[in-house]
Amino acid sequence: MIRIHCKKLHPEARLPKYATEGAAGMDISACLDEPISVEAQSVALVPTGLALEIPPGYEAQLRPRSGLALKHLISLPNAPATIDADFRGELKVILINHGKDAFEVKHGDRIAQMVIAKVEKVAVVEVAALSETKRGEGGFGHTGVEG
């Protein structure tokens, strides 16, 4: 098991926590002095009061919570959001409200999930041509069309 160092930037911040033994993601909670309203069809940047030290070769991915998406149409517009190993600032979550009504985020609300993932570095090699495949340049729904 790898270790992620986590620094509380606010005394009331809540450390990331797995809700169940089999959970892939840790719950991330809002750290607020007062509630934030995410207006309908708008976004809000929600602080967590936490900073992370992720080991080299890993990233943290922030993902939506399924219950917020299902019940309130609250999601993350850049999911999965990548937190790089060399970032040391406050972890903040961009929430988007796809619903028709404003959504209130209160201190301690679980607003996202965080998954730690291994990252492989690659070398980009410029070439004059690419190898041929059956699919070729077909994209954007190409494989979903019956012909």
From Swiss-Prot:
Record field: catalytic activity: dUTP + H2O = dUMP + diphosphate + H(+)
PANTHER family: DEOXYURIDINE 5'-TRIPHOSPHATE NUCLEOTIDOHYDROLASE
Source taxon at top rank: Bacteria
Cofactor: Mg(2+)
Keywords: Hydrolase, Magnesium, Metal-binding, Nucleotide metabolism
Keyword NADP included in the entry's annotation: no
Natural source organism: Chloroherpeton thalassium (strain ATCC 35110 / GB-78)
Role description: This enzyme is involved in nucleotide metabolism: it produces dUMP, the immediate precursor of thymidine nucleotides and it decreases the intracellular concentration of dUTP so that uracil cannot be incorporated into DNA.
EC number: 3.6.1.23
GO molecular function, one term: magnesium ion binding
Protein name (record): Deoxyuridine 5'-triphosphate nucleotidohydrolase
Enzyme class: hydrolase
Gene3D superfamilies: 2.70.40.10
Binding-site residues for substrate, renumbered to this chain: 65-67, 78, 82-84, 92
Pathway: Pyrimidine metabolism; dUMP biosynthesis; dUMP from dCTP (dUTP route): step 2/2
SUPFAM superfamilies: dUTPase-like (SSF51283)
Entry annotated with the keyword Magnesium: yes
GN (gene name): dut
A single BP term in Gene Ontology: dUMP biosynthetic process
Disulfide feature: none
Similarity field: Belongs to the dUTPase family.
